[in-house]
Every structure is written in C-alpha cells, then in structure tokens.
Amino acid sequence: MKDIELVYKGEIHRIPNRWDAMNDRQYIRLVGDFLRMAAGELSAGEVRINWLCDIMGWSKRKFHSEEQIANLVAISEQLTFMFQINYPDNNSVLDGVDEDTYELCRRIDPYRLNIPLARVLRRLDYQYVIDLCFCAQLIPSVQIGERSYPGYRIETSFGTLTCSLTALQYVEAQGLIERGEESLPLLAAILYYPEKDYNSERAHELANDFAKLPLETLTAISFNFQAFNNYLFSKTLFSLLSKFAHKPKQPITTDASDALYDLSKEGLGNAKQIEQMNVLTYLKVLRKKTIDAVKDMKGFGWDKLKISEEVGLPISVIDKIL
C-alpha cells in the first residue's frame, strides 16, 4: 500500500499508510482504539481519524467547518493498511473478480466504491477486521518499574529477514495466540525474555511482572507477534508450512511442539540445542523436511493423490514441489 501524498500551500505532505511508520507510543495508542472499537465505543472510521491526527500531529479540535471535517474524513478513508473488510461466506461474493478489484473491495467501504459491484456489497452484512500482517517490531522494549526488557528483534535490511527468537520461544508464543486476555502476560514474558538462553520456567515466573503492564501494551505485543507470524506464513517461503489441509500421519509432524523434538530424534541436536535454535533456521528445516518427504514419495512411485493423503498437502502444492 502506497503512502498518501497531499499538496497544501505548495508543500508536499506524506501520510504513512503502513504499520512500520509508527513509533511504539503511536502503535499502542492505536491498539487502545482497536480495543475501544471492539467494545463498541468507536467505529472503524473514528479509529482511522484518531490515528491520522496522531501520526500527523494534528488536533481534531481545530477542524471546525464542514469542509475541514469532510477533508479530514476523506483523507482518513485513504488509510487502508489497518483494516480489511470481510464479507459473508469467506468473501464468496468476490469470487471470480480480478485481483485489483478484490483488493479494492477488501479495503474500501462499499459505500465509498464507485463500481457496479458496490451495490451488491452494500446489501451484505460485512465487518471490519484488523489486518495483522506485517514484518516489524513496533515495541522494541518495555519498561516495568526500574527495569527495561528488550524485545525480540526483526530485521529486513539488505533484502534479508532475520529474527532473534529461538525455536522454543516461537513455539510457546504461537501456542498462546488464541488463549485470550489471561495469557497475555505470559506471552509478553516469553517474547521479551531478558536472558541470552531462553528458559520456559523462568519466563513463567516473569509473567507476574509483565502482568503489571497496561492491557493496551500487552495486547499490542500480542498483535505484533500475530502480525509477524501471519507474515511468515503468507509472505515468505515458509508459506508452504501453512498449506496442510489435515494433520498427516507420517513422516511430517505439523504440530509445532512435536516437530521441535522430532528434530532431536533425527540427530539434529539434543533437545536443549533444538530449543535454542533460531526460529528461522527451525522453519527452514521443517520446510526442507516437507519438500524432501514429497520428493521421496514420488521416487517410490506414489501418485499425487496418495502423496496428498499421506502428507496432508493439497495436490496443487505437491505439483509446485515436484
């Protein structure tokens, strides 16, 4: 998504239209508005306007006339990075449209669209959902009392993705994503673990300290990790690991914690060494295991249907591997 450019009094003003343009304060404040939206206190439009004013340093109180307010709303509606629009039946109404139209309909409210399909979309029960898919660490550290806890690092410089999480940190954090509000302090303690070698028991102890953080901060930490997790499995070569249609019998284990210790059984290191393995190395190993297993089965003379049933991958994915 492109940033927004405005020309005002001969000067060009650029408005960021992306997650990674925020500092930690702006991001946590946005998440606070997401929580208010979930509670029915704010609309999606109000969330966008609040963020626009915050990121640009504008005061909403200075927008008085109808024209000023209309301009503010019009600019805010160009901010498409934070929400997607979900239509019933997994967006089935958009089946068959071209990619550009699909993206437009998922980002722009149907009442603001000027295409024939918009009339159909307006009659449907659609919902705004937060689009959590980005590759950035928006909360580099958190302060609890007198102590600062640095978070995991994500780097994308020079066209290469790196992340400081260990395999065990990642697996444990991933397992907490759907656990709800009560698990947020533990999730934060795992992701902001302060010592070089990650230790699960110590992270559980630290969760009591992280419980002192505001709900907005804890939720922001969770959202950031979810976004990175979604990015890994939709925008990188690791997307292959998200294609399993069902849990295979053998030889691939798709459960993250089981797969972690299966690597130890295969001689890639003892359990401790596997736990401390870098998460991206861990995912590369799982991806290679998946590809090798499919190719081995093909070498045994298995047809694609049998491979699909055994491995759990759709035939279309198996075609790409082979």
Protein language model annotation of sequence segments:
Residues 1-300, 305, 310-322:
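An amphipathic, hydrophobic-aromatic interaction surface with interspersed Lys/Arg
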